[in-house]
Amino acid sequence: MQLTLWTYEGPPHVGAMRIAASMKGVHYVLHAPQGDTYADLLFTMIERRDQRPPVTYTTFQARDLGGDTAELVKRHVREAVDRFQPDALLVGESCTAELIQDQPGALAAGMGLTMPIVNLELPAYSKKENWGAAETFYQLVRTLLKDQAPAELNHDPKAWQHEGRRPRVNLLGPSLLGFRCRDDVLEIQRLLNMHGIDVGVVAPLGATVADVHRLPEADLNVCLYPEIAESSCAWLERSFGIPFTTTVPIGIGATHDFLVEVHNLLGMTPPSPQEGIRQSRLPWYSESVDSTYLTGKRVFIFGDGTHALAAARICKEELGFEVVGLGTYSREMARPVRAAAKAMGIEALISDDYLAVEAAMAAAAPELVLGTQMERHSAKRLGLPCAVISTPMHVQDVPARNSPQMGWEGANVIFDSWVHPLMMGLEEHLIGMFRHDFEFVDGHQSHLGHSGGSGAIADTEVAVSTLTDELVWTAEGEAELKKIPFFVRGKVRRNTEAFAKSTGRNQIDSETLYDAKAHFSA
């Protein structure tokens, strides 16, 4: 166990809560102390939902531990069933309640209830939120469908051709508190419909128990988020013979590969490679003169496995960036992330320690950071532009507008989100670079009025004149350093300090800066 100020994932019962809150007619009875009810805020504040998650807490207190806590569990289960009348009941325990060993799932199973009961055994001290969500969805699907499994697997994904209907697929994996899941579903539904493919069931987001029962009716399962749905897709393939996709359609190349995979599995003619060029603005920009400014920009990527891998591919193949850091906090996705990093000639960072991530970020000296909410804070401290690509996220990353990451429109959104920080960074640098010119000096009158400048444009970087006991930046040296673009300024500062130490200089002035530049450029 680790004491920390920040965690990328909550305990596994939060993942179970995400599945319950994503679905309709499903209720979750959580054996937990009073302090574990904080999770409600995640849905009402972050997701901005107008309803609380369908969760009943036993909320035992210290004085209850001397009595019969098992009876407390049964009473809350009974009350939840009578009040909410769910179609399926999830029963589990929080990390604190796990220590009591009351086994609430077994208690609920012995109460003679009529609806399906899913006993969730989520090891809170070895697993985390995404695993908990995946395990909950898997156990729910398995509980509801195990009696429908055929004796022999004879599923044919091309059966739609002789049945006189359009092909049908399920979209599996989107959930509440996922990154842009709602918008991704709309975009992928639109994309598949353009190609004559119907979407049968979307689960768990918005699905009912009846929808889960209809999962075997599809020709193909689309695994949109492997962290959540891969185990369920694999079980459906083993039990019903339904194949599933392995390509996540984030980016131009991945979206095309996804469409080719879907069409091949369904026995359809693959689409033209030119479709992405017609549908998205990203390929056009990548071929334009303007994009040459972005070529070779150093990028540090960190997030959940799905979005980190997608970001690395987009950066390398579609935007011409240089990936100098790649990592994930999802240990379940460590293997593919390590493989992708190795292919790019770097070492993957698999960690859930935000301080280790920040240290790696500083060492990589990137010009753009793609990460989670925490990387946004870290990048701000380091003076780097950042775009959020993954959960965990803040409310500002749950826009009311449609803003997908997947499909052709998702490529447009990604293009805006990633390129604008770099472009605006250049603008800020130019303003800072020419701030001493008479046209930029505070007090210079403009055509808008005669009251002078407002002082809105200020130098945001605090100069550190004394870095160590031995090294001192002179005012002249600091002034020269500020003429260097902000996104490489940190690297130049570190290189100059290292050069000054190696040459025995105590003060760093403009001459030292130029000497260091010549040394490292040689």
From Swiss-Prot:
Pfam families: Oxidored_nitro, PCP_red. Binds 1 [4Fe-4S] cluster per heterodimer. The cluster is bound at the heterodimer interface by residues from both subunits. Keywords: 4Fe-4S, ATP-binding, Chlorophyll biosynthesis, Iron, Iron-sulfur, Metal-binding, Nucleotide-binding, Oxidoreductase, Photosynthesis. Protochlorophyllide reductase is composed of three subunits; ChlL, ChlN and ChlB. Forms a heterotetramer of two ChlB and two ChlN subunits. Its EC number is 1.3.7.7. This is Light-independent protochlorophyllide reductase subunit B. Substrate binds at residues 425-426. Disulfide bonds: none annotated. One of its GO terms (molecular function) is oxidoreductase activity, acting on iron-sulfur proteins as donors. Component of the dark-operative protochlorophyllide reductase (DPOR) that uses Mg-ATP and reduced ferredoxin to reduce ring D of protochlorophyllide (Pchlide) to form chlorophyllide a (Chlide). This reaction is light-independent. The NB-protein (ChlN-ChlB) is the catalytic component of the complex. It catalyses: chlorophyllide a + oxidized 2[4Fe-4S]-[ferredoxin] + 2 ADP + 2 phosphate = protochlorophyllide a + reduced 2[4Fe-4S]-[ferredoxin] + 2 ATP + 2 H2O. It comes from Synechococcus sp. (strain CC9311). GO terms for biological process: light-independent chlorophyll biosynthetic process; photosynthesis, dark reaction. Its cofactor is [4Fe-4S] cluster. The active site is at residue 290. Pathway: Porphyrin-containing compound metabolism; chlorophyll biosynthesis (light-independent). Gene3D superfamilies: 1.20.89.20, Nitrogenase molybdenum iron protein domain, Proto-chlorophyllide reductase 57 kD subunit B. HAMAP family: ChlB_BchB. It is an enzyme of class 1 (oxidoreductase). [4Fe-4S] cluster binds at residue 36. InterPro entries: ChlB/BchB/BchZ, LI-POR_suB-like_C, Nase/OxRdtase_comp1, P-CP_red_C, Protochl_reductB, Protochlorophyllide_Rdtase. Belongs to the ChlB/BchB/BchZ family.
